[in-house]
């Protein structure tokens, strides 16, 4: 049996110019954020690209040439900070600095957001990396950890206990230690009954093999961990033999389920999904309201309007507003030739036009 970790490289390696197949999400990997207009300022200055933030790694690729890309696993990151950098596309600006170490080689990456004033580049990468760092219990073998509280296993998010077996001997010493054995969907945990701090947590991610072997204590459950976790060989004595066999079957079954869909424990949700640029664009609305008509303006009436004296205009305004609520007003308004602009000057001229259209020009001297 191979551990999931033997095939897992995404969070434990730094790679350049990876294939499209390697850029795809592996089982258990989730895309958390996607940022366009990101520049790899140190390696590809002046080249606009896209940054993918997953629960295991950060991927950058050029938009013009997708084969120009890089992948940075969170386990390789030593430090993340923000500094000022010189970008060909934005000039001097704040950038995200990521210092990594992989196979005794250090790499430094500088990413610049080409969208002015957007903090998503910093918040997404830094927050997801922090979530990765605080969820190592899902992925790392842990000895003498704070696992037990009031004789109960402290469950991780999304973790479920499938079996709890009392009276299990840990065979790490000559005389053995009596304790309690937990089988969950994420890991195997054992702790001593006399001392809760004497314990071990073995994630399925780190398990290389699960077998029943003979020992000086009789048949025992033997778990071999991956080389990355130290290559431990841990033995547990479970009685009776039938219970031992059932436990091995259950662990192997849960290990297969986990291998098909691993739970890496990196949980992070964007508080607000980024909006498209089109959604952020607000259409300008004019203050004036126009009602356009299909018919042409009556040239005769317009010529008569130009001959009305100031005194006559005032009389017409009074007549119009005293009859505003009569039936002809609404009817005339809807038959208006031309346009209405709701301001103090043009509305008076339009009302005058309505009145003359309905009553002729007999008041004009």
UniProtKB/Swiss-Prot annotation:
Pfam family, one: BBL5
InterPro entries named among the record's database cross-references: BBL5, BBS5/fem-3, BBS5_PH, PH-like_dom_sf
Gene Ontology biological process terms, A to Z: cilium assembly; intracellular transport
MF-aspect GO terms: phosphatidylinositol-3-phosphate binding
GO CC terms in record: BBSome; centriolar satellite; ciliary basal body; ciliary membrane; cytoplasm
Keywords: Cell membrane, Cell projection, Cilium, Cytoplasm, Cytoskeleton, Membrane
Homology family: Belongs to the BBS5 family.
Function of the molecule: Required for ciliogenesis.
Protein name as annotated: BBSome complex member BBS5
Organism this protein belongs to: Xenopus laevis
């Amino acid at each position: 049996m191979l551990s999931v970790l033997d095939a897992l490289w995404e969070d434990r390696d730094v790679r350049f110019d990876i294939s499209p197949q390697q850029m795809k999400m592996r089982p258990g990997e989730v895309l958390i954020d996607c940022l366009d207009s990101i520049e790899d300022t140190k390696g590809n200055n002046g080249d606009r690209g896209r940054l993918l933030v997953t629960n295991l790694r950060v991927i950058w690729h050029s938009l013009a040439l997708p084969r120009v890309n890089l992948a940075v696993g969170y386990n390789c990151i030593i430090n993340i900070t923000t500094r000022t950098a010189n970008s060909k596309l934005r000039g001097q600006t704040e950038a995200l600095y990521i210092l990594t170490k992989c196979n005794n080689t250090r790499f430094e990456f500088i990413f610049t957001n080409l969208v002015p004033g957007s903090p998503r580049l910093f918040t997404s990468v830094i927050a997801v990396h922090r979530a990765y760092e605080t969820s190592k219990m899902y992925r790392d073998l842990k000895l003498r950890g704070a696992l037990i509280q009031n004789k109960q296993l402290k469950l991780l998010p999304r973790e479920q206990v499938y079996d709890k077996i009392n009276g299990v001997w840990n065979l790490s010493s000559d005389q053995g230690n009596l304790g309690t054995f937990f089988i969950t969907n994420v890991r195997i945990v054992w702790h001593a009954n006399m001392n809760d701090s004497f314990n071990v947590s073995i994630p399925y991610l780190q398990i290389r093999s699960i077998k029943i072997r003979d020992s000086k204590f009789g048949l025992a459950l033997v778990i071999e961990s991956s080389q990355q976790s130290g290559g431990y060989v841990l033995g547990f004595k479970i009685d009776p033999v039938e219970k031992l066999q059932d436990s091995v079957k259950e662990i192997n079954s849960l290990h297969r389920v986990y291998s098909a869909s691993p739970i890496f424990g990196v949980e992070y949700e964007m508080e607000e999904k980024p909006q498209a640029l089109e959604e952020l664009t607000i259409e300008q609305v004019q203050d004036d309201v126009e009602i356009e008509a299909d018919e042409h303006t009556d040239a005769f009436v317009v010529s008569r309007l130009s001959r009305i004296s100031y005194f006559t205009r005032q009389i017409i305004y009074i007549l119009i507003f005293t009859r505003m609520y009569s039936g002809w007003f609404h009817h005339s308004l809807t038959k208006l030739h031309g346009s209405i602009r709701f301001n103090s000057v043009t509305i008076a001229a339009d009302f005058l036009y309505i009145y003359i259209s309905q009553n002729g020009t007999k008041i004009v001297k």
